[in-house]
């Protein structure tokens, strides 16, 4: 089963408002990613730009409206993610706990439907 592991950052945390991680954190993340690949859990991962780089698109009424900035103003934001393969939620949570330690941030785990 595949799981979405969201990396949650905040504007007052260890990363800057640009969403950058320290070189030590990046090295730890790279090592964790290598382990995910080696153990067959890797599907995909990526970091995301800072919330200030977001554009909200709303085309519900048939005419697209583009709004600069994040959908929701918040101290916490989605800084990156992993998509992992795990046989069950327990394994996914163990991997997420390791990911949280390596990136020095909170993470949220959700199964894909």
Predicted regions and their residues:
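Conserved, structured core segments of small domains
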Residues: 1-113
């Amino acid at each position: 089963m595949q799981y979405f592991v969201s990396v949650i950052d905040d504007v007052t945390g260890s990363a800057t408002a640009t969403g950058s991680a320290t070189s030590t954190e990046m090295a730890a993340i790279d090592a964790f990613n290598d382990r995910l690949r080696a153990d067959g859990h890797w599907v995909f991962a990526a970091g995301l730009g800072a919330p200030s780089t977001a554009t909200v698109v709303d085309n519900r009424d048939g005419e697209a409206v583009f709004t600069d900035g994040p959908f929701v103003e918040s101290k916490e934001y989605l800084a990156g993610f992993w998509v992992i393969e795990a046989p069950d939620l327990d394994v996914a949570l163990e991997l997420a706990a390791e990911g949280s330690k390596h990136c020095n941030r909170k993470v949220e785990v959700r199964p894909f439907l």
